[in-house]
Amino acid sequence: MPSLLIIVLIIHVVTYLINTIGANTIDSLLWLLYLKLPNQTSQTANEQRRLKREVMQLKREMNATSSQDEFAKWAKLRRRHDKTMEEYEAKNKALGKHKSSFDLAVKSIRFFSTTGLKLFLQFWCSKTPIFELPRGWIPWQVEWVLSFPRAPLGTVSIQIWGGVCATVVSLAGDAIGVVNVYLTSKAPKQKEPATSGENSARPMAIKKEL
């Protein structure tokens, strides 16, 4: 089993990545991946997309058909359009319910695996030291702060270690972002080819000089 030190660090790394990428972006990506799986929801989504294409096709055919000159054909298209539209709305409503349930499940898993787990560990392991400090290296006042609130004196508590992890992960993420921006700005740019106007102007300038 991984140590408490590593578990707390991983929780803060995952939390930082979720906040950086965006929870809504992750939810949308997971929903798209879920629809790729062979399940009832993916079948409903495929049927919904098929009905949407059919509704649009029937709409175009209705617009291209005169309701006065070709009333029988137009009325037949209208009935097909209304029936298909009703089926599409039913599938769309069912898919919306599936997505709401999926989003709720994803949000619950994300909360309990990050914030919920962090709060539980801080409560359950409040007396468990993350690691011990060398004796006599720092004043006892500092040892008391590092062991706050309930860890043994001379050790680092899970609350203090969690704060350190959050700060270090945030600084590391900012540093990586700065390095990425720097490398992107220093990337060699392709030389733009000279325009035809510039090429034609050069011989004329040479002739004038001669």
Curated annotation (Swiss-Prot):
Entry membrane topology: Multi-pass membrane protein
List UniProt keywords, sorted A-Z.
Coiled coil, Endoplasmic reticulum, Membrane, Transmembrane, Transmembrane helix, Transport
Q: Where are the transmembrane segments?
A: 5-24, 111-131, 156-172
Cellular component GO terms, alphabetical:
endoplasmic reticulum membrane; GET complex
| InterPro entries with a match to the protein in the record | Get1, Get1_fungi, Helix_hairpin_bin_sf
Q: Where in the cell is it found?
A: Endoplasmic reticulum membrane
Any ranges marked Lumenal in the topology annotation, and which? 1-4, 132-155
> Which Gene3D superfamilies does the annotation name?
Helix hairpin bin
The answer to whether UniProt assigns keyword Protease to this entry is: no
Instruction: Please indicate if the UniProt record lists Transport as a keyword.
Output: yes
Q: Which family does it belong to?
A: Belongs to the WRB/GET1 family.
Per its UniProt record, what HAMAP family does this chain match? Answer: Get1
UniProt protein name: Protein GET1
Organism from which the protein derives = Coccidioides immitis (strain RS)
Q: What is the name of the gene encoding this protein?
A: GET1
